[in-house]
Amino acid sequence: MNIKIPRIVIGGTGSGVGKTTIALALTQILRKKGLKVATFKCGPDYLDPTYHSRASQKICHNLDGWLMGKESVLNTFYQACHNVDIAIIEGMMGLFDGHSPNSEIGSTAEIAKWLASPVLVVLDTRGMARTVSAILKGLKIFDPDLNLAGAFANFTGSPSHIQLLKDASTEVPILGGLCKHSEQTFPERHLGLYSASEENVSEEKFNFWGEEGEKSLEVNSILEIANSAPEISIPVSNINTTLKRCKIGIAMDSAFHFYYEENLMRLRQAGAELVFFSPLSDSRLTDVDGLYFGGGYPEVFAPTLSKNKSLLNYIRDLSYKNIPIYAECGGLMYLSKGIKLVEGEFFPMLGLISATSIMEKKLKALGYVEVTTKKETIFGEVGLRFRGHQFRYSDLELDESNPIELVYNLRKRKSDQVSEEGYSKNSILASYIHAHWASNPNLAEGFVQSCLRK
């Protein structure tokens, strides 16, 4: 089918140039005008989408070419754009950065082409004048098939600096930008930005950037560019939602909230009713047939998680009854014997995995991976292949006296070397990998089937 939705991709010359801030400012301005805005984030990031969801008051969806493939990207875009007036897609890293230094696979540029979307690129223009024209010309001629329709000048010193840059840019129009305001930046920690739902991410900061954008962004020109986006063809999906067959508990609070919306959507389509609960504050769950623990910050909230003995005991009892439990990264840490912080303090957790989670100061793993199951799991049969991503500062110290079965063959995206991962015991499957279930539609169905057999 063909659809027409006004849209823009906000790319950048690299990370840290202010793509997120521009996207947030623009989202708030458009909502203030009465427009319904759908937001998207290119790549596997979980944190930026929390900001876009908060600004748009709609769930932000990830679009990742390598994890999802073209058909799933287009279908996710289509489904999220129902009853909206405009779509804003924030890129990742630099415009052409992705799977390989020699191709556009997995890049923002690839997503922009798949969506036939105009691109507005964000630059860090500190200490810059006429050079901005050279950079933009280079980006434009590097890939003539990309519709580079405009640019934003960020980290400028003053409104007059923005005007100077506009006058200098002859190849690509500069549609405004945001001046330096270091006191209004969003707070960060080891995995990046704080989640937008946390208390120290104030409404004041959101409002500030929206107001700054109103002063300096050429909104009418931006809307004109968005409206110029042509119709795109969306492959017809045959996915039908099955009648509710089981209930799956989803851990969702400040400690656990790293989920791809696509994964949750596929569980619903497979017939699962999702029951959200908080490992921080709930003492038990209503009757569930399975549990899903996503990633997050269990190390930050370790004292509170460890003190919630009622829920820990309740989940242990469910596990002893062989209820299927799937856990990723932070969820894996929660299933372990406990979390040892960098400072040395130890907090006991569920103890369902015979290992201890050790927090480190340095990054332990980052990047895309491809997984093949080498044994039957709660996802299904041997040989299932899927893709995922990892980003962590912790490691597992395994208990050699009580070995656990490893059920994943893991291959990093840029290597042929295979390693073992994926921790399985009875009806538990836990891993550091954040799996994207669009890479294999059988994962959601397999997990639901396991829940039905409990």
UniProtKB/Swiss-Prot annotation:
Coiled coil: none annotated. The keyword Magnesium applies. InterPro entries: CbiA/CobB_synth, Class_I_gatase-like, CobQ/CobB/MinD/ParA_Nub-bd_dom, GATase_3, P-loop_NTPase. Residues 247-442 form the GATase cobBQ-type domain. The record marks 434 as: Increases nucleophilicity of active site Cys. SUPFAM superfamilies: Class I glutamine amidotransferase-like, P-loop containing nucleoside triphosphate hydrolases. Pfam families: CbiA (PF01656), GATase_3 (PF07685). Pathway: Cofactor biosynthesis; adenosylcobalamin biosynthesis; cob(II)yrinate a,c-diamide from sirohydrochlorin (anaerobic route): step 10/10. Keywords: ATP-binding, Cobalamin biosynthesis, Glutamine amidotransferase, Ligase, Magnesium, Nucleotide-binding. One of its GO terms (molecular function) is ATP binding. GO terms for biological process: cobalamin biosynthetic process. Its cofactor is Mg(2+). The active site is at residue 329. NCBIfam families: cobB, PRK01077.1. The a and c carboxylates of cobyrinate are activated for nucleophilic attack via formation of a phosphorylated intermediate by ATP. CbiA catalyzes first the amidation of the c-carboxylate, and then that of the a-carboxylate. Belongs to the CobB/CbiA family. HAMAP family: CobB_CbiA. Catalyzes the ATP-dependent amidation of the two carboxylate groups at positions a and c of cobyrinate, using either L-glutamine or ammonia as the nitrogen source. This is Cobyrinate a,c-diamide synthase. It comes from Leptospira interrogans serogroup Icterohaemorrhagiae serovar copenhageni (strain Fiocruz L1-130).
